[in-house]
Amino acid sequence: MHRRVEWMTPTDDAILSLLGPPKQLELRSGDIARNTGYSRRRISDRCTVLVDRGLLFRDDEAGHPYYGLTDFGERYVAGELTVDNLEKA
């Protein structure tokens, strides 16, 4: 997909690809896990990192967190960011 920085993993690319264009989904970690083949725990851990780095947002509606791409995340998926942009995130 894209060139990753040191803190990123293949799981991150799977999450970002699933949530990104053309679908622009907002999903819970369990739904992301079912669609990517990674464990729910792994997805939850990586979503936390991606939220902290500004690539995902977390919506805690009714106590069930949903994740979706931020504008920064959309730019990453579109290939508009450099590795330097991500290293500073």
Curated annotation (Swiss-Prot):
Keyword field contains Repressor: yes
Gene: T6
Functional description taken from the UniProt entry: Transcriptional repressor expressed under lysogenic conditions, which specifically binds the host DNA site 'RRGAAG'. The binding occurs cooperatively, probably as 2 copies of a dimer. Possibly prevents RNA polymerase access to the promoters for lytic cell cycle transcription.
Induction of synthesis: Expressed in the lysogenic host.
Keyword terms, alphabetized: DNA-binding, Repressor, Transcription, Transcription regulation
Keyword Repressor: yes
Ranges of the DNA-binding region feature: 29-52
Protein's name according to its UniProt entry: Repressor protein
Coiled coil: none
InterPro entries linked to this entry: WH-like_DNA-bd_sf (IPR036388), WH_DNA-bd_sf (IPR036390)
GO molecular function: DNA binding; DNA-binding transcription repressor activity
